[in-house]
Regions:
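Active-site region of the double-stranded beta-helix
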Residues: 1-50, 65-165, 169-172
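Glycine-rich, mobile lid/loop segments that gate access to catalytic sites or pores
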Residues: 53
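Short, charged beta-turn/beta-strand-edge "cap" motif at the junction between a beta-strand
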Residues: 60-63
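Conserved small/polar residues in nucleotide/adenosyl-binding loops
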Residues: 178-180
Length: 180
């Protein structure tokens, strides 16, 4: 059980990190760390930079940190289990946590940090570079210099322009990010 998703880092501070995974070595240690609130010991932070890509498999503890702008693609799912919420309040009240359900679905041991983040900054130009293909979606990155024509052969396509300008189906598109 869980939700498959991925994040493309559009922008982030120079020293940015995301929560991806945890440091528990066994199911028992996972449960102990969570129930005892040993968050600094439990949570695994992964350094990131603009242009990084992260595939987040079901059962992976994950969270976006302050100042990070991401593009998220995910499996259609109504389920989110929150194991920790940094003691934030919504309308003066803590948000609902799902501690026991989270413990049941979190993968032990977590994927290694090295296997979590892909640098997409130096991919070939004018080529569809596949970042991930899974049961729920395919994600490509296209760095375009010049023109490219392609035929849309899939029933659904979502294209996101992250930087620059161009023309898509006769529509002029220009984008400049506000850096955060």
């Amino acid at each position: 059980m869980g939700k498959t998703e991925c994040w493309y880092i559009i922008d982030c501070p120079d020293d940015a990190k995301l929560v991806v995974g945890h440091n528990a070595k066994s199911q028992e240690e996972l449960s102990d760390m969570i129930h005892e609130g040993r968050w600094d010991e439990f949570i695994r932070y992964v350094p990131i930079k603009k242009g990084d890509f992260i595939q987040i498999d079901p059962g992976t503890v994950h969270a976006i940190t302050s100042g990070c702008m991401i593009l998220e693609t995910q499996q259609n799912s109504d389920i989110t289990y929150r194991v920790y919420d940094y003691d934030r309040l919504t309308n003066g009240k803590p948000r609902e946590l799902h501690v026991d359900k989270s413990i049941d679905v979190i993968t032990v041991q977590a994927k290694s940090t090295e296997d979590s983040v892909m640098d997409t900054n130096n991919l070939p130009q004018n080529k569809w570079n596949k970042l991930i293909e899974c049961e729920y979606y395919k994600v490509y990155k296209l760095v375009l210099d010049g023109e490219l024509e392609f035929e849309q052969s899939h029933p659904f396509l979502n294209m996101s322009v992250l930087d620059g300008e161009g023309t898509v189906n006769g529509q002029r598109i220009k984008l400049s990010l506000i850096h955060i």
